[in-house]
Amino acid sequence: MEKSKGQMKSRLSYAAGAFGNDVFYATLSTYFIMFVTTHLFNTGDPKQNSHYVLLITNIISILRILEVFIDPLIGNMIDNTNTKYGKFKPWVVGGGIISSITLLLLFTDLGGLNKTNPFLYLVLFGIIYLVMDVFYSIKDIGFWSMIPALSLDSHEREKMATFARIGSTIGANIVGVAIMPIVLFFSMTNNSGSGDKSGWFWFAFIVALIGVITSIAVGIGTREVESKIRDNNEKTSLKQVFKVLGQNDQLMWLSLGYWFYGLGINTLNALQLYYFTFILGDSGKYSILYGLNTVVGLVSVSLFPTLADKFNRKRLFYGCIAVMLGGIGIFSIAGTSLPIILTAAELFFIPQPLVFLVVFMIISDSVEYGQWKTGHRDESLTLSVRPLIDKLGGAMSNWLVSTFAVAAGMTTGASASTITTHQQFIFKLGMFAFPAATMLIGAFIVARKITLTEARHAKIVEELEHRFSVATSENEVKANVVSLVTPTTGYLVDLSSVNDEHFASGSMGKGFAIKPTDGAVFAPISGTIRQILPTRHAVGIESEDGVIVLIHVGIGTVKLNGEGFISYVEQGDRVEVGQKLLEFWSPIIEKNGLDDTVLVTVTNSEKFSAFHLEQKVGEKVEALSEVITFKKGE
């Protein structure tokens, strides 16, 4: 009971942290630029205002690109941290507090310096923005790196990630719901629906307060688990990231396509508030849009597994792009009709979480593709590519948003009534034509260059399994006699009779099979986990004597991509005989027309001259019963 309460406290605290993290990020990446373009400078000269706005935007873009080069240093700094409070929590709490305070400063004119001494203001703005950005990165990297440190249980990690995803989704969308009501409530003047500096300051104050409170909640409510397998992590450099990109063509082309896609959607998303303020003329209605987005986003994510199974990822991706382009087309002619605007905006928004998940899954699959192609596994480096692309795209889209807003006259003092037809046309080119073009470029790259389908990935994983067996078949064995116990309860099957060519032929090593009656899989020998596939259906263990044992649950189960499997171990873990390794659910395997037979082999069985089954084929054997003995010749 105490453990359950502790886990729930940790999940809720981590979800709160994700909520605060995305409230902060949405404010910084989408809404801060609105404050800069419409409220920060009011010199009385529109050209001078636009000049300063573009200078500020250039500073922001340069600093955000610079952050890409700083991030690996931050990651290595966090990796080398060792305090009594843990590795990550000090950075999450400290980074959250400092970044929140500096964000609040950015929503001010620094005591009127922007008027009395614009040059000094720009210098101080750059310094404060850099401090804010660096400490937000420290918090962000530390926060999202915490999950492996909060539990060694794969199942608990998945629950933790689910809680975080919910908190993140709500946080990202609730800002859109609340921003204009808060800004207008605290503003002294309405300014045609865009509020004033006072309103934006108090909005930033609330965001900063949420950032501080949720960061502290993570520090108090979570507990990092000590484990030797978390020590000596490989350090990541930007050079290594680009090296991995160069060696992994699927990752490289997907990253390029995703960058073009992200540039388009980030630009359009950030310009929506401008549309509601300067085209529709009612910024308060923007809350309705993001209220819908919050609900629709959660539903969209929940439908992903079903849609991916029915259409496959690439078809789902193309379908999403088509729906989004349709939404852009309708949005471009919606004018001031709120029902049409909301319909178009939702058509554009609904597929976005699905596209993100498609891209994330292909990037995850490219880990095995890269391993298959180069012979070494670069998991952390491969997965670090997406955040890198997001940041580069975000920096560019911020610059574009500012440029389009200035070109359309949507700066300090502007309102829907002052925007001319020509300026509306320029704005719509930036908001609709440009994103549509970049999304089409991204989709074209994916269509022409991405060949890593689910089926191909399954074959690659099977090939990696085979390579593991071949690579370890020559491992020297110190012991003369080795006995294995059954990893699960079921009926003993002759390995040569199973419906898998590699296992039946003995090319994966000698061993046995079990037709299971239970879903728990235990270690048949003591040793170290040398391989645990991301699909969680196979585990490789090396004993202290050099014996390599492969436990493979099911035939063709790689196609399930982990569905129906729970892993309790990680690569590098030390396990004892009888320790639970996996759990699987046979109904899911059978529902997909697959065989749930558990296959067990000694991949370096060639080092033994003989083996003997201690149980009769066809008879039921209990888990952890002695089942096979390998012997060397005299």
Curated annotation (Swiss-Prot):
Q: Which intervals of the chain are annotated as region Permease?
A: 1-490
Domain (PTS EIIA type-1): residue spans on this chain = 500-604
Can the keyword Kinase be found in this entry's annotation?
Answer: yes
* Comment text on domains: The PTS EIIA type-1 domain may serve a regulatory function, through its phosphorylation activity.
Q: Which organism is it from?
A: Streptococcus thermophilus
Query: Sorted alphabetically, which NCBIfam families does this protein's record hold?
Result: gph, PTBA
Residue positions where Phosphohistidine is found in the record: H552
Q: What is this protein called?
A: Lactose permease
Query: Does the record carry Lipid biosynthesis as a key word?
Result: no
Disulphide-bonded residues? none
InterPro entries in UniProt: Dup_hybrid_motif (IPR011055), MFS_2 (IPR039672), MFS_trans_sf (IPR036259), Na/Gal_symport (IPR001927), Na/Gal_symport_CS (IPR018043), PTS_EIIA_1_perm (IPR001127)
Name the keywords, alphabetized: Cell membrane, Kinase, Membrane, Phosphoprotein, Sugar transport, Symport, Transferase, Transmembrane, Transmembrane helix, Transport
Topology in membrane: Multi-pass membrane protein
Task: Write down the EC number.
Answer: 2.7.1.-
Biological process (GO) annotations?
Answer: phosphoenolpyruvate-dependent sugar phosphotransferase system; sodium ion transport
**Membrane-spanning ranges:** 16-36, 54-74, 91-111, 118-138, 166-186, 200-220, 251-271, 288-308, 316-336, 340-360, 399-419, 425-445
Q: What does this protein do?
A: Responsible for transport of beta-galactosides into the cell, with the concomitant uptake of protons (symport system), and also for transport of homologous and heterologous exchange of beta-galactosides.
Q: Which CDD domains match?
A: MFS_MelB_like (cd17332), PTS_IIA_glc (cd00210)
Q: Which family does it belong to?
A: In the N-terminal section; belongs to the sodium:galactoside symporter (TC 2.A.2) family.
This entry carries the following GO cellular component terms, namely: plasma membrane
Q: What GO annotations for molecular function exist for this entry?
A: kinase activity; symporter activity
